[in-house]
Amino acid sequence: MVSALKCSLAVAVMISLACSAYAIKCYQCESLTMPKCGLKFEADETLLLDCSRIGPPRYLQNFFPLRNATGCMKKTLESVAGHPQIVRSCYFGDINNIQAGCQSDPSMPFVKQLGCDVCTKDECNGSSSLAPIAGAILLFFGVARLLA
């Protein structure tokens, strides 16, 4: 009975850590409505979004239905007026082939996309993406050692 309880506890710890390890947080903003989101970015906690809580944009849902975000992105767009606009958001798609995930929104035909940068770290500027996984593995072995 005790070993079954220990095993259940270890599995529960691993599941909760695995879920948190794959959730990525990205900044979500547009420089058109929020100047601090522009080229001179001013980090702000209120702009952070847990990407596991949202799905891909409508125009990408045919390509990535019910898929979790795989990274963060920063798109540089040129509006009709010719001014550069920065859009920061969660990225949905293959990190190794960003062409599909970075495609332009077809509902905005007059906006030209100048660039799309993709990264796989929280907030695109901080902790290594392997750090949460490595921590989860170490914690699992620590719990297993205690329960043994």
From Swiss-Prot:
Any single GO CC term annotated in Swiss-Prot or TrEMBL for this entry: membrane
Effect of gene knockout: Enhanced rolling escape behavior in response to nociception (perception of pain).
Positions of the propeptide segment: 126-148
Membrane topology classification: Lipid-anchor; GPI-anchor
Keyword entries, A-Z: Cell membrane, Cell projection, Disulfide bond, Glycoprotein, GPI-anchor, Lipoprotein, Membrane, Signal, Transmembrane, Transmembrane helix
Transmembrane segments annotated in the record for this chain: 128-148
Signal peptide: 1-23
Disulfide bonds, paired cysteine numbers: C26-C72, C29-C37, C51-C90, C102-C116, C119-C124
Remarks, miscellaneous: Larvae display an instinctive escape response to nociception (the sensing of noxious stimuli such as harsh mechanical attacks) consisting of an abrupt bending of the body followed by a corkscrew-like roll reminiscent of an athletics high-jump technique referred to as the belly roll.
Function comment: Necessary for the maintenance of persistent fluctuating activities and suppression of acute evoked activities in abdominal leucokinin-producing (ABLK) neurons to negatively regulate neuron excitability involved in nociceptive (perception of pain) behavioral responses.
Name of the molecule in the record: UPAR/Ly6 domain-containing protein bero
